[in-house]
Amino acid sequence: MASGQESRKELDRKAREGETVVPGGTGGKSVEAQEHLAEGRSRGGQTRREQLGQQGYSEMGKKGGLSTTDESGGERAAREGVTIDESKFTK
């Protein structure tokens, strides 16, 4: 059991140095904080999927995937002729 505690301490040290040690925990300053951030982000995505339905969630992902630092996903979709059905964004 001591090795588990040592491993967690090592992860905590890395987290304090700014390294992400838990997937989805970016920005947390400890292992525990990163775990909470990751859990909240996951739950937020699940809630959004429930609100929009699977098709709306997929369409929104398509639009978001087209966004860049220079232009929004909607602008790029219009420029490139990609069809995004925004009527699916509401359930």
Curated annotation (Swiss-Prot):
Query: Which portions of the sequence form the region Disordered?
Result: 1-91
Listed under GO biological process in this entry are: response to abscisic acid
The organism's place on the tree of life at top rank? Eukaryota
Coiled-coil segments on the chain, per record: none
Q: Where is the composition biased (Basic and acidic residues)?
A: 1-19, 32-51
Pfam family for this entry, one: LEA_5
The protein's matches in PROSITE patterns, at most eight in alphabetical order, are given as: SMALL_HYDR_PLANT_SEED
Instruction: Provide the induction entry.
Output: By abscisic acid (ABA) and osmotic stress.
Q: Which UniProt keywords apply?
A: Stress response
Residue ranges spanning the membrane: these are none
Instruction: Please give the family membership noted in the entry.
Output: Belongs to the small hydrophilic plant seed protein family.
- Function, as annotated: LEA proteins are late embryonic proteins abundant in higher plant seed embryos. They may play an essential role in seed survival and in controlling water exchanges during seed desiccation and imbibition.
Name of this chain's protein: Late embryogenesis abundant protein EMB564
Q: Which organism is it from?
A: Zea mays (Maize)
